[in-house]
Every structure is written in structure tokens, then in C-alpha cells.
A protein has these predicted regions:
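A surface-exposed partner-binding patch
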Residues: 1-98, 139-140
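Compact, glycine/acidic-enriched structural inserts
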Residues: 116-135
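Short aromatic-glycine-(Arg/Gly/Cys) micro-motifs in beta-strand/loop hairpins
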Residues: 107-112
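Mid-sequence acidic-hydrophobic segments that form the walls
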Residues: 106, 134, 138
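Short acidic-glycine loop/turn motifs at beta-strand connectors
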Residues: 101-104
């Protein structure tokens, strides 16, 4: 995970500036999960242990934190309730929510598609590493 964060930090075009937050502790992650009654996937916990949220590439991507006082905390729905409650929202990229669907153990870029057709209609990633790889690839190509 740290390698990907360093790769993002090294992309330094003017509009591509990225800001990373201080790491979250395991106890902060556990407390958030308990309080919010959510289960954060392990690959996103690995990110949180490196950076408790981030703004990537001038705001093209926002990765949510476990800081309960942040507006952009995990499960923040900027669409005002249009994301199915079954999806765990961990951020957004361009116009899509970055979500985790426990049914499939996968991450998706979700933009108001039919929840029952999410696998057919949305970009799917097996873990959060793949999400970051995709975002990095788009940024550098």
C-alpha cells in the first residue's frame, strides 16, 4: 500500500496535487466500525493505516476516513441517499462513488446503476489495491 501512496505523491503536475491524512490506528478503525455498524474490508483498512483519508489528483478522487467528525467519512453519500444502503461508500472518483459490496467481496465505481445489476453495469475491482492502480493508471496515461 505504501508503494502506491508514494507513487501518487510522485505525480506532481500542477492540478494533480494529492493530500494524505495522518494514519488511523487499529483502535480508531475498530471504534468506527462498531459505532457505525459497518465492516471495512481489509484492503481498505491497510490504506487507512497509512492514511486516514486522502484527496487525490486535485480532488478527482476523495478517499474517506474513519474520523467521525469529517464530512467525508466512510459511508458519506454525497448523492443524498441514492446509493443503496447495502454498499459501503469509501470515497468518490469523478462522478462515481467508490463502494464495497460484501455480497461479492468486491469494490465498484457506482453511479446510480440498478443495485441488482451492479456486476454487469459497474467497474469491479477485487480489492482496494486494484482501485488505486486504476486511478493511478488514468492519472499518468
Amino acid at each position: 500500500m505504501q508503494e502506491r501512496i508514494e507513487q501518487i505523491k510522485n505525480i506532481v503536475e500542477n492540478w494533480m496535487h494529492s493530500d494524505f491524512h495522518s494514519p488511523a490506528t487499529d483502535s480508531e478503525i475498530s471504534e468506527f466500525e462498531e459505532k457505525m455498524k459497518v465492516k471495512i474490508p481489509e484492503s481498505y483498512k491497510e490504506f487507512l493505516r497509512c492514511s486516514n483519508g486522502a484527496e487525490l489528483f486535485g480532488g478527482d478522487a476523495i478517499l474517506f476516513s474513519v474520523n467521525a467528525s469529517d464530512k467525508c467519512k466512510i459511508n458519506y453519500d454525497f448523492s443524498e441517499g441514492k446509493v443503496p444502503k447495502e454498499l459501503l461508500i469509501i470515497g468518490f472518483y469523478n462522478s462515481c462513488h467508490i463502494c464495497y459490496d460484501a455480497r461479492y467481496g468486491s469494490f465498484f465505481f457506482y453511479e446510480y446503476e440498478d443495485y441488482d445489476s451492479i456486476k454487469e453495469e459497474c467497474l469491479e475491482f477485487s480489492d482496494f489495491y486494484e482501485v488505486l492502480d486504476y486511478i493511478i493508471d488514468i492519472a499518468i496515461n
